[in-house]
């Protein structure tokens, strides 16, 4: 359990103002120049030592990603912050954007300095109107106070931060599709290689990080890499914002230590499962794109490695709780429809496969199918998985794979009952 003094996002619930004055009282912008004066290598090394892994879903080492940027590039370098939070069940970045914007802005300055980027773009989800308004006001305050812009914080480093609003496409949360959108093109993922660190925004070296990944950096540097690394578990260090929704008594966002047991997280902060733990049917532990877990596996620890061991993933940390009243087959079919709708259509397996999977899922929902179709559906998900430019194909396949893995009997029972009816 995370100690109160170890929490990074003190204003996660918006109980205080998000303005600069209040943010400074919470410790933001304290001695930022001194942090920058320690140099780029020190900053990257500290972030590496902290063990910070990307909080957007992939879990890649943040410090390692920064180190891929060229040190003496002839082209300008860019930092891009992915604030296009559109994953069903996920709303952590939204609260940072509207209640803790200065943590993000300060993190942008430090990260930009570390990778040698004089320009940073925050790409924010189009539907986040109020969040974008709060963010822009915070940016204006930071410019007025000389915290960013020319000679940011008196460091001699110039850093401009721009807010760019998206237009509502889930696919633009994929880093290269986001870059295409920023350039004014249709948001469609790029083939890799080349990777963004070598050929990113406008063909220049670019680092793309999640909102939460960037927002925790100033606190890590102030309190030390060893402090952050001591929280959580080895290889799964630090704090994480978890979003708990669905059939719980008190849906909430909560910052906790990595590795906290899923059951403890739900019972301590979300008031428990509606109707008690015995009424639990399944949980999606990391946003809509990771496989669900049946009740028998729901006491797993919430970190990248533990969830991978049980056949799921931490993803974004968006926990969706489903009790026994849930039509689990329809719940996953609804996710299939989402991915069908959000496919950009570039890759044939995803373009054709997501629609096909949804149609078969609806047959299974009604029970109007043959048992052999279950195996056919599973085989098709495996043909889509890993055969697309981006991970949307994987994201569409995994929920169905999880359903068949853990609730195959229920699907077969529905098919059997349809014939009887």
Curated annotation (Swiss-Prot):
Annotated cofactor note: Binds 1 FMN. Binds 1 [4Fe-4S] cluster.
Residues reported in the UniProt entry to bind FMN: 166-213
Binding, NAD(+): 54-63
Cofactor entry: FMN; [4Fe-4S] cluster
Keyword Heme (UniProt): no
Keyword Translocase listed: yes
Documented EC number(s): 7.1.1.-
Keywords, alphabetical: 4Fe-4S, Flavoprotein, FMN, Iron, Iron-sulfur, Metal-binding, NAD, Quinone, Translocase
GO molecular function, one term: metal ion binding
PROSITE patterns: COMPLEX1_51K_1, COMPLEX1_51K_2
Catalytic activity: a quinone + NADH + 5 H(+)(in) = a quinol + NAD(+) + 4 H(+)(out)
Pfam families per record: Complex1_51K, NADH_4Fe-4S, SLBB_2
Signal peptide: none
Binding positions for [4Fe-4S] cluster per the UniProt entry: 344, 347, 350, 390
UniProt function note: NDH-1 shuttles electrons from NADH, via FMN and iron-sulfur (Fe-S) centers, to quinones in the respiratory chain. Couples the redox reaction to proton translocation (for every two electrons transferred, four hydrogen ions are translocated across the cytoplasmic membrane), and thus conserves the redox energy in a proton gradient.
Family: Belongs to the complex I 51 kDa subunit family.
Listed PANTHER family: NADH DEHYDROGENASE [UBIQUINONE] FLAVOPROTEIN 1, MITOCHONDRIAL, NADH-UBIQUINONE OXIDOREDUCTASE FLAVOPROTEIN 1 NDUFV1
Name the UniProt record assigns to this protein: NADH-quinone oxidoreductase subunit F
Encoding gene, per UniProt annotation: nuoF
């Amino acid at each position: 359990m995370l100690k109160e003094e170890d929490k990074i996002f003190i204003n996660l619930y918006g109980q205080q103002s998000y303005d600069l004055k209040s943010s400074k009282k919470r410790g933001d912008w304290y001695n930022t120049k001194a942090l920058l004066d320690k140099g780029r290598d020190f900053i990257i090394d500290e972030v590496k030592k902290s063990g910070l892994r990307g909080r957007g879903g992939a879990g890649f080492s943040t410090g390692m990603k920064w180190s891929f940027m060229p040190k003496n590039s002839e082209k300008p370098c860019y930092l891009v912050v992915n604030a296009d939070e559109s994953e069903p069940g996920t709303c952590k970045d939204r609260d940072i954007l509207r209640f803790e914007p200065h943590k993000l802005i300060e993190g942008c300055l430090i990260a930009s300095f570390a990778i040698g980027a004089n320009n940073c773009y925050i790409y924010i989800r189009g539907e986040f109107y109020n969040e974008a308004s709060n963010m822009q006001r915070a940016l204006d305050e930071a410019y007025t106070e000389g915290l960013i812009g020319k000679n940011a914080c008196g460091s001699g480093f110039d850093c401009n931060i721009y807010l760019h609003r998206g237009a509502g496409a889930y696919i633009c949360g994929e880093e290269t599709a986001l870059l295409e959108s920023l350039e004014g093109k249709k948001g469609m993922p790029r083939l890799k290689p080349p990777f963004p660190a070598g050929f990113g925004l406008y063909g220049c070296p670019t680092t793309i990080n999640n909102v939460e990944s960037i927002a925790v950096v100033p606190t890590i540097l102030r309190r030390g890499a060893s402090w952050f690394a001591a929280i959580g578990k080895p290889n799964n260090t630090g704090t994480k914002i978890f979003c708990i929704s669905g059939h719980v008594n008190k849906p909430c966002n909560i910052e906790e230590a990595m590795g906290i047991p899923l059951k403890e997280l739900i019972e301590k902060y979300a008031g428990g499962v509606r109707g008690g733990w015995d009424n639990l049917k399944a949980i999606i532990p990391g946003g809509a794109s990771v496989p669900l877990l049946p009740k028998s596996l729901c006491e797993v620890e919430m970190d990248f490695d533990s969830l991978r061991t049980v056949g799921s993933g931490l993803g974004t940390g968006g926990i969706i709780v489903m009790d026994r009243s849930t039509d689990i087959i329809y719940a996953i079919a609804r996710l299939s429809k989402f991915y069908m709708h959000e496919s950009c259509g570039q890759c044939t397996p995803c373009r054709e496969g997501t629609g096909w999977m949804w149609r078969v899922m609806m047959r299974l929902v009604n029970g109007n199918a043959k048992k052999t179709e279950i195996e056919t559906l599973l085989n098709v998900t495996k043909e889509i998985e890993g055969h697309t430019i981006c991970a949307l194909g994987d994201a569409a396949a995994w929920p169905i794979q999880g359903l068949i893995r853990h609730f195959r009997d229920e699907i077969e029972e529905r098919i059997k009952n349809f014939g009887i009816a």
